[in-house]
């Protein structure tokens, strides 16, 4: 049965957006699509974080969702956090049109991202290839510009 989820991204900055998630079968890939506005032109890290807690803004969402205790990587890497969705690219108008298909996240089961926080970051994610310890944890993606809890949609 197809499952759907949605996330409304908001933050202290002008960055905002709506991201949709769609999974046709329980172990199938998840389509991630939508748009984010108010960004600076270029790449911005895009991750699912562990907790759905936004009581202290995006910082209370915890680290990247990583149930397999792996190092940070890119979305196509074998070694990655479940929540590592790579980067979104904003155009000169600050708009990122998101269209990702990912086979590691899920909307059900052990790797479900429902109830967790989606975050868009200030800087590009170096996909774990930055050559320092922070790269293997966060991809050096910098501060959290906007976030929202991923919820079930109809």
Swiss-Prot record:
Q: Where in the cell is it found?
A: Cytoplasm; Nucleus
Q: Which residues carry this modification: N-acetylalanine?
A: 2
Gene Ontology MF: a single term: protein-folding chaperone binding
Question: Which coenzymes or cofactors are required?
Answer: Cu cation; Zn(2+)
Matching Gene3D superfamilies: Superoxide dismutase, copper/zinc binding domain (2.60.40.200)
- Describe PTMs of this protein: Palmitoylation helps nuclear targeting and decreases catalytic activity.
The UniProt entry lists the main location of this chain as: cytoplasm
Binding site residues for Cu cation: 47, 49, 64, 121
* Any single biological process term in GO: muscle cell cellular homeostasis
Instruction: Write out the GO cellular component annotations.
Output: cytoplasm; cytoplasmic vesicle; cytosol; dendrite cytoplasm; mitochondrion; neuronal cell body; nucleus; protein-containing complex
Pfam families given for it?
A: Sod_Cu
List residues, modification N6-succinyllysine. Answer: 4, 10, 92, 123, 137
Q: Which residues carry this modification: Phosphoserine?
A: 99, 103, 106, 108
N6-acetyllysine modification sites are 123, 137
* Disulphide linkage map: 58-147
Please, which domain of life does this record's source organism belong to?
A: Eukaryota
Q: Which reaction does it catalyse?
A: 2 superoxide + 2 H(+) = H2O2 + O2
Q: What class of enzyme is it?
A: oxidoreductase
Q: What does this protein do?
A: Destroys radicals which are normally produced within the cells and which are toxic to biological systems.
- Family according to the record: Belongs to the Cu-Zn superoxide dismutase family.
> What name has this protein been given in UniProt?
Superoxide dismutase [Cu-Zn]
